[in-house]
Every structure is written in structure tokens, then in C-alpha cells.
Amino acid sequence: GKFGENPEDVSAYASSSFYAVDRFASYTQFWKEDYQSGAVIVADRYSTSNIVFQMSKLPRDEWDAFIQWVQDYEYNKLGLPQPDCTVYLDMPPSVSQKLLSGRYHGDERKKDIHERNTVYLRACRESAAYAAKMLGWLVINCAEGDNAKPMEQIHRELMKELAGEINLYV
């Protein structure tokens, strides 16, 4: 919120750069050796998040170029590892809003600028669906109708999908 009140107040490219440099610092300081030794690394909100959250700020006819830019910048120029598998946990914003209201006990003021902006959240979901299709991500549907699936069910579905991707035994 320090750069504006709305996600669109900061350009997709500037925001992506901030997050990419933060990822670079994390990689070089904390997990580069593990990665290079062959460890399985699970990351929440890796470079693919830049694609989803920042691309949603752009006109649709610029999405392919933005995906290429993020991938070139992060993987080629910064030297960050490219993910072998990306999982997108899909949930309609209407369902996530219900969960947030519960988390914050109905106090809408506790939501951050992104959580408050349902137009932005819908745009992010649209950009995520596009990126998932274009980049071959695994998609796990985390809602049934107007309700979130139980975490245990999401976990089972995720493990089943991942079993084929990374040779897990479930």
C-alpha cells in the first residue's frame, strides 16, 4: 500500500521487478545450495505469481509478451531456477471473500488493498487461468459451488495430481 491505494497504481513491470529481486535474494541466501544438490523445492508465490498478479493489470493483447518478459527476466537474466511443475489452486473470488470475512470476523478494514479489490481479484483469476493454460500448469479446483472444498479434499486431489508429475507415492 505504500506505492498507492490500488494494485494498478504501480506498473506491472515495476512491481514484477521488486518481487523478482526479492526472490533472487531469497534464492542466493537461503536455498540455492539445496536446489543445486537436487533437493525438491516447494515454493509458494514464486515467479509464476508475478505472471498472475501483474499481468492482470495489462490489456489482454499484452499478456503473451508479459509472460515472455517475466520468464526472460527471472530465469535468464537473474538466473532463478525455472519450476518443473506449477500448481494453481483455483478459487472464485466470491468464495475467497467469504473465507476472508471469516478470518477477519467481518471487519472489512483488515483486508489489504488486494483483498478489498474484487475487480482486481477477478482479473487475477482470469490471468491465472490464461497462464495455466498457456504454460501447462496443474489446476486444482478448490471450490464446489459457493463454498470452499475441505482442505483434506484439496490435499487429496493435489497429491493425486502431483503423483504423476514428480513420482510421488500416494
Task: Pin down the residues of each PLM region.
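A glycine- and Lys/Arg-enriched "phosphate-lid" helix/loop adjacent to the NTP-binding pocket
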Residues: 48-126
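NTP-dependent small-molecule kinase module
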Residues: 94-170
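ATP-dependent small-molecule kinase phosphotransfer cores
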Residues: 1-72, 76-78
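Hydrophobic/aromatic beta-strand patches that form the interior of the parallel beta-sheet core
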Residues: 42, 85-87, 138-140
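Short secondary-structure boundary segments
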Residues: 45, 90, 143
